[in-house]
Amino acid sequence: MRNNKNQMYIIKIFIALAMITGIIFLCLFYSSLTPSKLKIGAKTSNMDDSPKIKFTLIDQEGKKFDSTHLQGHLSLIYFGTTYSLYDNQALKRVEDIIKILKKENIVVQVVFITLDPQHDTSEVLKKYLEKIDDNFIGLTGRVQDIEQLADQFKVFYTSKIFDVKTNEYELQHSNFVYLISSQGKFLKHYCLGLPKNG
């Protein structure tokens, strides 16, 4: 019964993502029910086979946040930077998804993990997320810890460069949101359909 309930939650999350990203509803719903044939915007993982995600970082309050905080509820994880316009748009899409899920009484924790911890300190993350949704959790930490976690999620990203045309920094990266189970295991990842640069 619990597995059926979790499966229904996942389907509803998938549908909410589809509504926000503009993917055809029926195709996504069909894909959700047949994960072995899933081809549109997401990849699935067998929860029993997936290892638990392990990390220890620092949140926007300057407190330790480790992987045990992912247990007991569903989580959506997004990697990016505070200075990227595209990441700002992506997080606002995630915020829209959360609003849809709340109407279905589905509680999902959102975790934003910076790919530039040298710039995105706890203080920077706190100010940034207050403008989007102060219920979101922002994580930073040592460069090597971020690199190891990004590697666990297979996140692609490049070194930060300064764009003289825009007078801003840019860091190119893959643009996925990751769904984590209440056991702290990877379930699916979804493409938000935004440009990868930023």
UniProtKB/Swiss-Prot annotation:
Signal peptide: none annotated. Belongs to the SCO1/2 family. Gene3D superfamilies: Glutaredoxin. It holds the Pfam family SCO1-SenC. InterPro entries: SCO1/SenC, Thioredoxin-like_sf. It comes from the Bacteria. This is SCO2-like protein RF_0043.
